[in-house]
């Protein structure tokens, strides 16, 4: 049944510039009716009071065990100072190992060391040295690769260059193929070589067909190696971990959680490097606890638990965890705390539209945020809605106050504009959901890609990141280039696949899975399969765009790809934001609770 509306609302929507068919692989359908570029809706307030409450559909979500966990924690500042002193003393020794010698073999060794630094969580200590090594080595690739027949070495060199945005041809792996055109079976017993090739294969683009073959080849054989018991136990565990989360798609801060214990059990590990990694990681853990004491105190003072109905996700610590995907180094507490506050604004906005607000309330909130001030109808709305609106507006006022002295007011203004856009997307989906409407898949994705908050999240990251965002950075984001469009689509589909059962359990049918099932007449499992194919293709496009995008600063491209890594961790077979009790809880425990031993 179609929803009926009364007074009118007009909201702006930006048309996507990257055609959907280029990602989805099937032709766009022509639809008649109202254009999505300029929706005019009529609203009515016929339902009031108890009648309004009786039709709400929402699941009460459990209170998080983390919200008050860190209030009583005490961090010893003198311990942190001692760790910094030890790190400062060891850093020159490690730097000397990286940069001391010259020549092709030495360049090759330095590039191999980059993989170790990233894996141990130490890359941020040596960014200049890493960039210099790769810049100098890029012109020597052919010489380095000439006659190199070690699979592990070739794979890691390939991985290092592509990881940092340098294009190197995947043809370097043709030397490992036999006369039959397949990868040589003799490679299958070389566990570390196979593991390195597996990691490298995840950096493939749409044209790297050999890497698609490599991924298939290594995946099956690594599973066998890990299961058969021929590998050392610590290597088998490591293989199982990377099969679940390849390093390329992992949050950078989570990689050393698993790799440091693995490296410690390697017979040829470097004691200085291992000690440096442990000291660095422990300092990070202490800094995170300090941050969490601040953000959870801020969150407690908002009093959401007593002021709002229990429809929202009580996820302040989860918000902070996801911030670490893009800002994890110890000196950036200020930026992490601000971004956590921003993520909280996005989360309460999404929950209000998605899980609780009636249509008249959704219209009033959308109009108020479009005006960036309460509209006339807001006075007639429930108190909870006024609290949500006031929280968002006041939080941005604080951002403005903090950043204006630094000459960064434009970042707040640009972020507000993206916040308005995601509000529009939330409203559009809420309108469909209230009407129990399942649109065409393409129509849904056009709206859903904005609603999923990728662009608004990136705007907040730009606002908070250390390398001050420029107006050009925001213009790039606003133009919705292929990089951004693809990331939006990937996030939308992963969210809808992993959250499908939750959506259906609360009567929320406006979902990519339902849209695809309806349009193409397929089953749920068939829809999952087809949508996952789109996601696999999207991963290749993201790699391609990271390597080929020009005129955009590397820090902006890296932040964008780090967001892709956050999305991978959030939806890796589960919906990790709404239900962080499983794997996400394990990750948070490893970072915030289980202190690394020295």
From Swiss-Prot:
Name of protein: Terpenoid synthase 26
Pathway(s) this gene product operates in, as recorded in its UniProt entry: Secondary metabolite biosynthesis; terpenoid biosynthesis
Function: Involved in terpene biosynthesis in roots. Possesses sesquiterpene (C15) synthase activity and diterpene (C20) synthase activity in vitro.
Keyword Cell membrane set for record: no
Cofactor note: Binds 3 Mg(2+) or Mn(2+) ions per subunit.
Entry comment, domain topic: The Asp-Asp-Xaa-Xaa-Asp/Glu (DDXXD/E) motif is important for the catalytic activity, presumably through binding to Mg(2+).
E.C. no: 4.2.3.-
Pfam families associated with the record: Terpene_synth, Terpene_synth_C
Gene giving rise to this polypeptide: TPS26
Record-stated family: Belongs to the terpene synthase family. Tpsa subfamily.
Known tissue expression: Predominantly expressed in roots but also in stems, leaves and flowers.
Superkingdom: Eukaryota
Localization in the cell: Cytoplasm
Binding site for Mg(2+) 3: 495, 503
GO MF, one example: magnesium ion binding
Matching InterPro entries: Isoprenoid_synthase_dom_sf, Terpene_cyclase-like_1_C, Terpene_cyclase_plant_C1, Terpene_synth_N, Terpene_synth_N_sf, Terpene_synthase-like, Terpene_synthase_metal-bd, Terpenoid_cyclase/PrenylTrfase
């Amino acid at each position: 049944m179609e929803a009926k509306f009364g007074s009118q609302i007009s909201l702006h929507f930006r048309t996507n510039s990257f055609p959907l068919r280029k990602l989805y692989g099937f032709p766009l359908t022509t639809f008649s009716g109202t254009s999505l570029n300029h929706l005019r809706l009529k609203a009515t307030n016929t339902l009031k009071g108890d009648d309004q409450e009786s039709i709400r559909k929402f699941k009460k979500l459990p209170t998080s065990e983390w919200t008050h966990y860190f209030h009583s924690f005490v961090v010893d500042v003198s311990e942190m100072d001692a760790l910094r002193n030890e790190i400062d003393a060891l850093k020159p020794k490690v730097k000397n190992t990286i940069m001391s010698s010259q020549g092709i073999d030495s360049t090759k060794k330095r590039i191999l060391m980059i993989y170790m630094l990233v894996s141990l969580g130490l890359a941020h200590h040596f960014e200049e040295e890493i960039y210099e090594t790769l810049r100098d080595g890029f012109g020597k690739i052919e010489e380095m690769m000439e006659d190199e027949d070690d699979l592990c070495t070739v794979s890691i060199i390939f991985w290092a260059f592509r990881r940092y945005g340098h294009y190197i041809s995947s043809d370097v792996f043709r030397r490992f193929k036999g006369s039959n055109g397949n990868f040589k079976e003799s490679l299958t017993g070389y566990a570390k070589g196979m593991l390195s090739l597996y990691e490298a294969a995840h950096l493939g683009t749409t044209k790297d067909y050999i890497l698609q073959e490599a991924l298939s080849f290594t995946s099956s054989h690594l599973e066998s190696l890990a299961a058969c018991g021929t590998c050392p136990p610590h290597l088998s565990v490591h293989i199982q971990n990377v099969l679940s989360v390849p390093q390329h798609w992992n949050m950078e801060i989570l990689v050393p959680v698993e790799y440091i214990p693995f490296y410690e059990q390697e017979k040829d590990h470097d004691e200085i490097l291992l000690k440096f990694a442990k000291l660095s990681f422990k300092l990070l853990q202490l800094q995170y606890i300090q941050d969490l004491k601040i953000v959870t105190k801020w969150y407690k003072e908002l009093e959401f638990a007593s002021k709002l109905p229990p429809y929202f996700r009580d996820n302040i610590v989860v918000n902070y965890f996801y911030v670490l995907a893009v800002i994890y180094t110890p000196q950036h507490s200020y930026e992490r705390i601000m971004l956590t506050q921003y993520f909280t604004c996005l989360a309460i906005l999404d929950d209000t539209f998605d899980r609780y607000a009636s249509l008249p309330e959704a219209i009033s909130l959308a109009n108020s945020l479009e005006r960036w001030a309460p509209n006339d109808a807001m006075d007639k709305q429930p108190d909870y809605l006024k609290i949500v609106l006031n929280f968002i507006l006041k939080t941005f006022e604080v951002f403005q106050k903090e950043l204006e002295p630094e000459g960064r007011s434009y970042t707040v203004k640009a972020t507000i504009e993206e916040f308005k856009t995601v509000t529009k997307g939330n409203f559009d989906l809420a309108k469909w959901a209230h009407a129990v409407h399942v649109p065409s898949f393409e129509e849904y994705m056009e709206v859903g890609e904005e609603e999923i908050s990728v662009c608004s999240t990136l705007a907040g990251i730009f606002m908070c990141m250390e390398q001050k965002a420029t107006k050009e950075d925001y213009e790039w984001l606003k133009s919705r280039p292929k990089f951004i469009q693809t990331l939006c689509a990937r996030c939308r589909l992963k969210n809808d696949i992993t959250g499908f059962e939750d959506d259906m359990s609360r009567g929320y049918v406006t979902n990519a899975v339902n849209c695809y099932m309806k349009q193409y007449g397929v089953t749920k499992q068939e829809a999952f399969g087809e949508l996952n194919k789109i996601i696999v293709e999207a991963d290749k496009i993201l790699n391609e765009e990271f390597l080929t995008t020009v005129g955009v600063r590397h820090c902006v491209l890296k932040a964008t790809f780090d967001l892709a890594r956050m999305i991978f961790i959030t939806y890796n077979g589960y919906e990790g934001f709404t239900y962080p009790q499983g794997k996400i809880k394990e990750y948070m425990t490893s970072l915030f609770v289980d202190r690394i031993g020295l």
